[in-house]
Amino acid sequence: MPGIPLVSRETSSCSRSTEQMCHEDSRLRISEEEEIAAEESLAAYCKPVELYNIIQRRAIRNPLFLQRCLHYKIEAKHKRRIQMTVFLSGAIDAGVQTQKLFPLYILLARLVSPKPVAEYSAVYRFSRACILTGGLGVDGVSQAQANFLLPDMNRLALEAKSGSLAILFISFAGAQNSQFGIDSGKIHSGNIGGHCLWSKIPLQSLYASWQKSPNMDLGQRVDTVSLVEMQPCFIKLKSMSEEKCVSIQVPSNPLTSSSPQQVQVTISAEEVGSTEKSPYSSFSYNDISSSSLLQIIRLRTGNVVFNYRYYNNKLQKTEVTEDFSCPFCLVKCASFKGLRYHLPSTHDLLNFEFWVTEEFQAVNVSLKTETMISKVNEDDVDPKQQTFFFSSKKFRRRRQKSQVRSSRQGPHLGLGCEVLDKTDDAHSVRSEKSRIPPGKHYERIGGAESGQRVPPGTSPADVQSCGDPDYVQSIAGSTMLQFAKTRKISIERSDLRNRSLLQKRQFFHSHRAQPMALEQVLSDRDSEDEVDDDVADFEDRRMLDDFVDVTKDEKQMMHMWNSFVRKQRVLADGHIPWACEAFSRLHGPIMVRTPHLIWCWRVFMVKLWNHGLLDARTMNNCNTFLEQLQI
C-alpha cells in the first residue's frame, strides 16, 4: 500500500483526539506469540490489496470515464491562472466630474496588426466587454469592477513580451448628446462607429510589476495603481461571430475644448490555482526531522491519514497519501468528500471510518470478516471444499443386468443380494446400514465357494431349500420391501441435505449475472433459453431443404456456416474476419475432399468482401491455408 509511514507518536506533541486517531503499534506491549498472531492478522490485508492491484493495472490502459472526467477537473482546478480585477479608485482632475465617464467599457483586447490599417491607427480584437455603470463609493473607490481570467505566468510571459495584449478603456461621455457620438446601448449590435474617449494599459508593464512582486509567488494578491489619461478618438465596432473588432482612429488635431481627464485605476492580480494550496505543499519530505514531519503533513492540504487496523482492532499501521489519493487504486479524488464516496463504493471488501479534525483528515480501515471468512456449516465443514450432487428431477435407479439375470437363477442367488447400486453415495450407504435391524445382518455360510449369505439362525436345511423358486421369490420380495423403505428414507434425507446446502449458497444467472432465488434454481423451467444444437441443426437443414434454386453443395455450405456462426456466437461485423479464418481451419479438410464446397466458400467470401465485411488480407490467408491442405 503506497503512502508515507508516520513516525512514532511519542516524539510529537499532538492533541488527545489526534492520538486516538493516529496511534502506533509501539505503545502496546505484546508477547512473541501475540506478535506472530498480529502479523498473521495484518497479512489478511494481502488478498483484497492484491485484487485491487490487479484491477488497477487493468484500468491503466483503459481508465473509467468518471475517473477521466475527475482527472480533467483536478487539472483545471490546480492549473495556475491569474484572476485580474479592474476598478476605478478616484480622479485627480477635479474640474471634470468622474461620473461623466460612465458607462465605462473595459476590454481585454489583442492587437490584430501593429501596422495601421487604412485610416485607423490600431485594430484590436476582443471577446467580451465589461461595463462599469455605477459611481464611486466610499473613499472614492468604484463599487463596480471588471474581472478577467488570464493564462498562467509562463504563457502570460510570452503574450506580454509580444506586446499584443492591452486593457482598453472606452467611455461615451456625453456622446448621446453629441452629434459626433454614438449610442452606448448599441455597442453590442452590429457595425457602428462614432467619437468617444479612450485609453489603454499595456499588459507588458503590468506583467513586469507582477514579476517583481514577491506576493505573487506566495499566492497572495498584488495591487497595482495606474493613471490613465482619456483621449478623444473615433472608433468603429465590427462584430464577427463570437469575436469582435474595434478600430481606433486618433485625430491628428484633437479638440482643445475638452481637456483630457486622468483617472486612477487599481488592478488586482491573484493566482487562482495556487490559492487552494498551502505554502508547505511545495516542500519535500527529504532532509526533514521527525519532529517537523508531522507539522508539515498536517499543514499540507490533500494529505489524508489512513489507519489500517488489525488484531481485533488492537493494533494499526498508519500511512499518509497526498492529493486525496486512494491508497489502493491511486485515484485522486480531488477532495475528502470525493474520497468518502469513492472508498465504500469501489473497495467494498473493507470497512471505512472517516475522521475530520482541525489537524487531520483520517480514515480508519478494517477488514470485513463476513466476506473474508468462509461460512461453516453445522458439521464444521467448509461448503466450498465439500462435494455434493444436485438434480432438480428425481431419477430412478436401475439394477445392473447381472442382478436381474441372477434373480432368475435361484441356486446362484444369495439371500443377501445387494439391492442398492454401487453408484450410491457414501451418505446413503451409511444411512441404510444404520436403518437395518441387527437381526437382518447377513453371514456367509458354507465357505467362499458357496457364494451364499444367510441370516443368523438359519439351518442348513433352509439353505438347501433355497433352490425352490417360490421360496426365493418370497424371501427376495420381503427383502426388497425392507430395502425399498430404507432407500426411500435415504433419498429423502439426501434431498434435504442437498437443499440445506443450496440455501447457504448464492447462485447467479449465467446470462444476466443477477442473483437468483432458490425457487428459480429448483424450478424445472429453463431460464437460460438454451438452444439444443441438434435441434437447431435439424431445423436449419429442414429450412434449407425448402430451397429449390440452390444446389446440394450450396445447401451444405450454408448449413456449415450457419452452425458455425451459432455455436461460436458470431454477432458483430467485426467478428467476420476471425470467423472466416476459423471456419477455414475447422472445415478445411472437409472442403478439400469436395472441390465444389471450396468454390462455394470462395464465392461466399467474395460476397462478404463486396459488402465490406471481409478484407483482402483475411481472404488471402483463408485461400492460402486451403491450398496448403490440397498439397
Swiss-Prot record:
The keyword Transcription applies. Disulfide bonds: none annotated. GO terms for molecular function: chromatin DNA binding; DNA binding; DNA-binding transcription factor activity; transcription cis-regulatory region binding; zinc ion binding. Widely expressed throughout the life cycle with higher levels in proliferating tissues. Expressed in both vegetative and the reproductive shoot meristems. It is found in: Nucleus. Pfam families: DUF7651, VEFS-Box, Zn_SUZ12. GO terms for cellular component: nucleus. Residues 424-465 are annotated as: Disordered. Keywords: Chromatin regulator, Developmental protein, Differentiation, Flowering, Metal-binding, Nucleus, Repressor, Transcription, Transcription regulation, Zinc, Zinc-finger. Residues 505-583 are annotated as: VEFS-box. A zinc finger (C2H2-type) spans 324-347. PROSITE patterns: ZINC_FINGER_C2H2_1. GO terms for biological process: cell differentiation; chromatin organization; flower development; negative regulation of flower development. Residues 424-446 have a biased composition (Basic and acidic residues). Belongs to the VEFS (VRN2-EMF2-FIS2-SU(Z)12) family. Polycomb group (PcG) protein. Involved in flowering processes by repressing unknown target genes and preventing reproductive development. Participates in polycomb group (PcG) protein complex-mediated (probably in complex with EMF1) silencing of the flower homeotic genes AGAMOUS (AG), PISTILLATA (PI), and APETALA3 (AP3), as well as of some regulatory genes such as ABSCISIC ACID INSENSITIVE3 (ABI3), LONG VEGETATIVE PHASE1 (LOV1), and FLOWERING LOCUS C (FLC) during vegetative development, by mediating trimethylation of histone 3 lysine 27 on the AG chromatin (H3K27me3). In plants, PcG complexes are probably composed of a member of the EZ family (CLF or MEA), FIE, and a member of the VEFS family (FIS2, VRN2 or EMF2). Binds to ALP1. This is Polycomb group protein EMBRYONIC FLOWER 2. It comes from Arabidopsis thaliana.
